[in-house]
Amino acid sequence: MNAIFDNYRLLDTLSHEDEADFRVFLQDPDNLEDGLMAVAGLTLNLLENHWSEHKLMTILTSCDGIAPEMFERIVVGVMLIMMRYDREIRHNQTLLEDLQEVLTFAPELSFTALSNIARTTQIKRMEQFNRQLTQELMPLMNDRHSNEFYDIIRSRQSEMEHIAKMHLDQNFLIFREFYSTPFFRNDASNWLLPWNDKALLNVKEEDRDDVAGLLDLWPLCDSDKYALCQMYDSFKGVIKSQLSVDSLKEVGLDMPKNQIVTNGYVQQLYRFFRLSSHTQIRPFDLAYHLRDLMVYRLIVVGERAKESIDQLLA
């Protein structure tokens, strides 16, 4: 249990003391995890409860001089908050100016974060594709050399290429069943923990080098890393049979590092809201209406940017 996360997630009103502590957590260079969990907790507080301009302004005015990882969490969280409270925000000109100042401080980061939020709209399409492909191939699994087996693969080739090209979250399909452990079931904060190598101690000693090697090559979000450590012993046969070092290198090298980091936090939040029993809201469903929201207008500037985001929402 992370006391800082729980405190900021569950508090009703943000007192002056809470606000001062929040800023201290974000400014402490020696304890990055406390700041990251404070940001996650206050973000969830806003998303899961009622609108509070004071809480949002506390987040927005705490950005100066903080670590890049913390700022990335703030940008992603602020975008989801803007989506959730679009009606309250869109006519508040002063607040919109403050939001724009934060979101345009690092425009490439903000555009990448919004792109990754838009990209989540394709996950259900990807799930449907996988279900259909499995249903079609299952009767032929004992005869993989049949013409019919390869005809089906060829007929689905364009969709497979689309999934690869769009950098869709294929790891979600792999790891969604890994989140049933007590580690996630009993503690909401574990879904949003930053990665700590100490988690490798949960892996059998003879498997630790293998898991560490996978983590070095596989661009997983932090909660997927924890899930892998929790469940590796049960699934290592499947993992070893399906993955190769070359394929993992290709996936990792194909995406810029800043996109992997930002996308990782988007994926952590997506897993929390989609898979966790600790929450009842689904803020990522609002991404289907992204073009109608103020966050889209603030971030998507120019035809090329519009075309890029709209392609993800198609």
Language-model regions: role of each:
Residues 85-163:
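Eukaryote-biased recognition of long, low-complexity, charge-rich segments
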Residues 199-314:
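Alpha-solenoid helical-repeat scaffolds
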Residues 3-10, 35-43, 72-79, 109-119:
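Amphipathic alpha-helical elements of HEAT/ARM-like alpha-solenoid repeat scaffolds that form extended
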Residues 1-29:
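N-terminal uDENN/longin-like adaptor modules and analogous extended polar/low-complexity scaffolding regions
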Residues 60-67, 71, 75-79, 142, ...:
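Long, charge-dense low-complexity segments
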Residues 14-22, 34, 38, 51-58, ...:
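Structural recognition of alpha-solenoid helical scaffolds
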Residues 27-97, 314:
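Alpha-helical protein-protein interaction scaffolds
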Residues 128, 148, 155, 162-179, ...:
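C-terminal regulatory domains involved in ligand/effector binding and gene-expression control
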